[in-house]
Regions:
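Basic nucleic-acid-binding interfaces
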Residues: 1-74
Length: 74
């Protein structure tokens, strides 16, 4: 399995937007994303860098694979 690099919040948001997720709101230091066809919400920390494990957890919650996420990142 491929390793997820350390990313900036904007990069994570951009990748999820390419899969149909949209920014619902931003409260404090987190960006909340939703998708009309998915009941889950994604909470992306708006810090200088997102820890390596956070995108991996969000990928699973969004119903994606790591490979799909990484290919959209390029």
């Amino acid at each position: 399995m491929a390793q997820v690099p350390i990313l900036r919040p904007g990069e994570v948001v951009r990748v999820f937007q390419s899969f149909g997720w949209g920014i619902a709101r931003q409260r404090g230091s987190h960006i909340i994303m939703t998708k009309p066809t998915n009941i889950a919400t994604l909470s992306i920390p708006d810090h200088p860098q997102v820890a390596r494990g956070t995108p991996r957890a969000l990928i699973g919650r969004a119903g994606l694979t790591v490979d799909e996420f990484l290919s959209a990142l390029k």
